[in-house]
Amino acid sequence: MAAQPLLRILCLAGFRQSERGFREKTGALRKALRGRAELVCLSGPHPVVDAAGSEGARPDSGPCPPEEQPQGWWFSEQEADVFLALEEPTACRGLEEALETVAQALNKLGPFDGILGFSQGAALAALVCALGQGGDPRFPLPRFVILVSGFCPRGLGLMEPIMQGPLSLPSLHVFGDTDGVIPSQESMQLCSRFDGAVTLTHSGGHFIPAAAPQRQAYLKFLDQFAD
């Protein structure tokens, strides 16, 4: 019997995560989905200069390799390299470059069956799906999307494509009851914009869970896309 082909999933990192750091953060998930899915990690296009103490930051002040440089998808202030998910931004600086980065990855690294996003990456993934459903040729709709600690992006019309109408692709929304960065109600609001959304809650905080109970939920969700 031939082996089941792997589902290919483009994974969008959170804010202040380096490419290497995000690969490490998704290591448990990659192990949980071994033999079922291939995870291709992508970090944002913008270096986050003031990232001391953040995910992926080095303890010294010396230069770090590109794969270890903390990155972001866009910033919520015009001058500062910051992102505040729960506040109305004064700008969405760098967003178009973020969208172009995803478009290039889809074109050059694809095809992909699904998209997974974490935190800011989940907000971007939702926006990409909304733009694709609205006819943006850069973003053909994936077969599914997995949004971990997601939220509706704020500012400069970002929320409108998501709020205009229900998104009609299968979605799994993963969030923690004690997430102090993205409160669960933010993830639930995003979840409400998808038809037939599936939720996976856990008792933890701001991370991608991959223990046995979550593994079964991921596999059950992905089973419907097995060829």
From Swiss-Prot:
The active site is at residues 119, 179, 206. GO terms for molecular function: hydrolase activity. SUPFAM superfamilies: alpha/beta-Hydrolases. InterPro entries: AB_hydrolase_fold, FSH-like_dom, LovG. It comes from the Eukaryota. It catalyses: a carboxylic ester + H2O = an alcohol + a carboxylate + H(+). It is an enzyme of class 3 (hydrolase). Keywords: Hydrolase, Serine esterase. GO terms for cellular component: cytoplasm; nucleus. Its EC number is 3.1.1.1. Pfam families: FSH1. Belongs to the LovG family. Exhibits ester hydrolase activity with a strong preference for long-chain alkyl ester substrates and high selectivity against a variety of short, branched, and substituted esters. Is able to hydrolyze ester bonds within a wide range of p-nitrophenyl derivatives (C2-C14) in vitro, with a strong preference toward substrates of >8 carbons. This is Esterase OVCA2. It comes from Bos taurus. The lineage of its organism: Eukaryota, Metazoa, Chordata, Craniata, Vertebrata.
